[in-house]
From Swiss-Prot:
It catalyses: Hydrolysis of terminal, non-reducing beta-D-glucosyl residues with release of beta-D-glucose. Its EC number is 3.2.1.21. Glycans are attached at residues 229, 278, 349, 507. This is Beta-glucosidase 40. Disulfide bonds join 217-225. The keyword Hydrolase applies. The gene is BGLU40. GO terms for molecular function: beta-glucosidase activity. InterPro entries: Glyco_hydro_1, Glyco_hydro_1_N_CS, Glycoside_hydrolase_SF.
Length: 510
């Protein structure tokens, strides 16, 4: 009965948010600026170490699973790697000045675990410590606040070789030791910590479908992967990530928070899902899709356990929190980071034939999520095949978080769109990115409405990304940056039109 009441409650919540989505959309076209947002609202750009730094063998850095994966033939769309990336390791001062020129308040970047501990554990690489001290100090000297991510997918290869990394609970202690060194060495200046970036993505892409490092899966009769278990490993990885986050949070709160005055959160990848129809089964399917995405990680951190839909559908394959673990996990964050790019339709998957064939975690939700209904797409497409432009989804998602999780502090830790990188597109034409300007204008308008009209507790917004960069399995085929990086001319940075738009936006208080 309790389970049925919960389903009814969540169904009503999905219906309410869907109705809000259909409300007056005039805010989407409203003129906005920094002054449209609350005083103290943070604007910044985001990056990750592996996608931006390059210098993979410089000054004692150890190899990561993404070094291995990107050098494996056929894994990257354009057969590239991130050995150089956009060379931010050497050009950080130039890039910090670009942020300053725009009027950005903050920079979200990640620390490479193997620059601090080349083998994941053991001796500390002081050259790595020195590099991040220089970056943090350079940011602060320009009035830019560092928001530091401790893990953005670049697991030390040594730990994967030794005990399969996130599949082994040993990683909890090893990551905690790494995190504590970061708190000790950087915490006097870093006031916002993010433990993990998109655990849902690296659990699914790395351990279910095998399209990202470390490339483990059993779908399609192991045609694309040599080892793994797509029906169990994603849940084991997710469980160990949640326990690791909670352990690190406990350490920070007990030993560093009072002295350093910082806060600690985690960043999730979150699509919004609209029911494909007003049928109850599709509304419930949209809720399940969200349970198996955001709820998988945020429910334990807020409530101490996984969503009931996951418990009932995954069964014994879903790990169980002990009583003490549940207490440790519950409430172990100060803010929620949301990486939001797009919205899909969701419908009930009554037959689940594909799920029966694949027998993997993706199919467990019993939903089909697609960016089109019939012959119509949900919005215009960016360059990436998965990224459709649906600004209203931002407002709907913020309201969902408000109502389900009690309106916690939220930072939009990533939002952006890409253009294709093609030799047929001249640099002159690539700088004319009106589509990106409209994307950010409309998503920011939707976000502003969620704050001003709906009372959502959103504290900041980070653009992905300052620079074009190496986009994981897509390599250099995709350009997300506000600045164009010329890969054929010494990685020179050129401002796109969106830089000028953001500069005007950030320097206007009207």
């Amino acid at each position: 009965m309790a389970h049925r009441r919960l389903i009814m409650t969540m169904t009503k919540m999905m219906m309410m948010v869907t109705m809000m989505m259909m409300m007056d959309k005039t805010c989407i076209c409203a003129d906005i600026s920094r002054g449209s947002f609350p005083k103290g609202f943070v604007f910044g750009t985001a990056s990750s170490a592996f996608q931006h730094e390059g210098a993979v063998k410089a000054e004692g850095r150890g190899p990561t699973i993404w070094d291995t994966f990107s050098h494996t033939f056929g894994k990257i769309t354009d057969f590239s790697n991130a050995d150089v990336a956009v060379d931010q390791y050497h050009r950080y001062e130039e890039d910090v000045q670009l942020m300053k020129n725009m009027g950005m308040d903050a920079y979200r970047f990640s620390i490479s675990w193997t620059r601090i501990f080349p083998n994941g554990v053991g001796h500390i690489n002081e050259a790595g410590i020195d590099h991040y001290n220089k970056l943090i100090n350079a940011l602060l000297a320009k009035g830019i606040e560092p928001y530091v991510t401790l893990y953005h997918w670049d697991l030390p290869q040594a730990l994967h070789d030794r005990y399969l990394g996130w599949l082994n609970p040993q990683i909890i202690n090893d990551f905690a030791a790494y995190a504590e060194v970061c708190f000790q060495r950087f915490g006097d200046r870093v006031k916002h910590w993010i433990t993990f970036n998109e655990p849902h993505t690296f659990a699914i892409q790395g351990y279910d479908v095998g399209l990202q490092a470390p490339g483990r899966c059993t779908i399609l009769f192991k045609l694309t992967c040599r080892e793994g278990n797509s029906s169990t490993e994603p849940y084991i990885v997710g469980h160990n990530v949640i326990l690791t986050h909670a352990t690190v949070s406990d350490i920070y709160r007990k030993k560093y928070k009072a002295k350093q005055g910082g806060s600690l959160g985690i960043a999730f990848d979150v699509m919004w899902f609209e029911p494909e129809s007003n049928k109850t089964e599709d509304i419930e399917a949209a809720q399940r899709a969200q349970d198996f995405q955001l709820g998988w990680f945020l429910d334990p951190l807020m409530f101490g356990d996984y969503p009931s839909s996951m418990r009932s559908r995954v069964g014994s394959r879903l790990p169980v929190f002990t009583g003490s673990q549940s207490s440790l996990v519950k409430g172990s964050l100060d803010f929620v980071g949301i990486n939001h790019y797009t919205t899909y339709y969701a419908r009930n998957n009554a037959t689940n034939l594909i799920g029966t064939l694949l027998h993997d975690a993706v199919s467990d939700s019993g939903t089909v999520t697609l960016p089109f209904k019939g012959l119509s797409t949900i919005g215009d497409r960016a360059s990436s095949i998965w990224l459709y432009i649906v600004p209203r989804g931002m407002r709907s998602l913020m309201n969902y978080i408000k109502h389900r999780y009690g309106n916690p502090p939220v930072f939009i830790t990533e939002n952006g769109m890409d253009d294709p990188n093609s030799i047929l597109i001249s640099r002159k034409d690539a700088l004319k990115d009106a589509k990106r300007i409209k994307y950010h204008h409309d998503y920011l308008s939707s976000l502003q409405a969620s704050i001003k009209e709906d009372g959502c507790n959103v504290k900041g917004y980070f653009v992905w990304s300052l620079l074009d960069n190496w986009e994981w399995a897509a390599g250099y085929s995709s350009r997300f940056g506000l600045y164009f990086v010329d890969y054929r001319d010494n990685l020179k940075r050129y401002p796109k039109d969106s830089v000028h738009w953001f500069t005007s936006f950030l320097n206007s208080t009207s």
